[in-house]
């Protein structure tokens, strides 16, 4: 059995060890970061719904993300056939959906989730893509504590 190659990456929260299996490739980058393609998901703490989507090319670029289903049950993401091909989707069970999180400094009660621009990851193919939801009922600044997206 082949041994997994490990690599140390620098992040805003210190050094972390990842395996090559943990690298997710974004062929189009992310909105605003089109030139960054390789990322890793880093768990911040064991029971937290939040993760860090860390660029492997830029240690200063780490986006706080969360599973939107931790905050709402009926969130839906639409993917075009072209997006499914880019993500190499064979089965929807391969997909994980994340949304970016903004926590204003010193004001955690004003935390917002970007439901209008989810990040979809094929966990088997290690491919990711940010998929803007055009004509969506979901806002880009959803406050989970007191918003209703509809």
From Swiss-Prot:
SUPFAM superfamilies: BH3618-like (SSF141457). One of its GO terms (cellular component) is cytoplasm. Its main location: cytoplasm. One of its GO terms (biological process) is regulation of translation. Pfam families: FliW (PF02623). Interacts with translational regulator CsrA and flagellin(s). Belongs to the FliW family. Acts as an anti-CsrA protein, binds CsrA and prevents it from repressing translation of its target genes, one of which is flagellin. Binds to flagellin and participates in the assembly of the flagellum. Residues 129-150 are annotated as: Disordered. It comes from Maridesulfovibrio salexigens (strain ATCC 14822 / DSM 2638 / NCIMB 8403 / VKM B-1763) (Desulfovibrio salexigens). Keywords: Bacterial flagellum biogenesis, Chaperone, Cytoplasm, Translation regulation. NCBIfam families: PRK13285.1-1. This is Flagellar assembly factor FliW. It is found in: Cytoplasm.
């Amino acid at each position: 059995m082949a041994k997994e190659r490990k690599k140390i990456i620098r992040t805003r929260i210190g050094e972390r060890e990842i395996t090559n299996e943990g690298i997710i490739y974004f062929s189009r980058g992310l909105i605003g970061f089109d030139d960054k393609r390789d990322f890793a998901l880093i768990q911040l703490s064991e029971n937290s719904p939040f993760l860090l989507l860390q660029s492997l090319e830029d240690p200063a670029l780490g986006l706080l993300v969360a599973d939107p289903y931790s905050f709402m049950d009926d969130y839906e993401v639409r993917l075009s056939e072209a997006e499914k091909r880019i993500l190499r989707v064979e089965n929807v069970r391969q997909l994980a959906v994340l949304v970016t999180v903004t926590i204003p400094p010193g004001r955690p009660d004003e935390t917002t989730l970007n439901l209008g621009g989810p990040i979809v990851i094929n966990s088997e193919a290690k491919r990711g893509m940010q998929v803007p939801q055009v004509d969506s009922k979901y806002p880009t600044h959803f406050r989970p504590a007191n918003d209703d997206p509809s």
